[in-house]
């Protein structure tokens, strides 16, 4: 098959007792023969009272052990929450024993991403410098939740929102 399935907590956790195991097994069975990617997997464990999330974890662990020759499971998230997540079940660390830490992008790389998401816009030299300065400042002030390309996309969406607001204000002036 060689297919790819990406899921999050909502795709695995049910709405009532017993529903989570069924829902999780459906996803796991669909992933057989392919790759299952669970983004922000630590969201399955939202605290000590999260029985539904724990039910999903307890369904995943034996399933991937029994089917390790027929699927690849990749879990992703920020480093610290991932380490905490891997401690929630004794079988997790041994089943996910390869870790890849991606370095954050530098200013030039973030600017290339910005150019990609804003390809339909033209930026003059002054604006380009301001954008690069903003991206550089974003890196200098980042915290453990820094979103790299996601933060660049959000930055661009914010620029578009402000542009739309200015155009609306301008059209109000012209109409009057």
Predicted regions and their residues:
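C-terminal helical "lid" of AAA+/P-loop NTPase domains
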Residues: 147-169
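Short glycine-rich substrate-engagement loop in P-loop NTPases that contacts/grips substrate
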Residues: 2-31
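Conserved C-terminal "switch" segment of AAA+ ATPases
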Residues: 81-87, 102-145, 164-171
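Conserved catalytic/switch belt of AAA+ P-loop NTPases
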Residues: 42-93
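Short loop/turn elements that form and flank the Walker-type P-loop nucleotide-binding site
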Residues: 30-33, 66-70, 146
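Flexible beta-alpha connector loops of hexameric P-loop NTPases
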Residues: 9-20, 43-54, 99-101
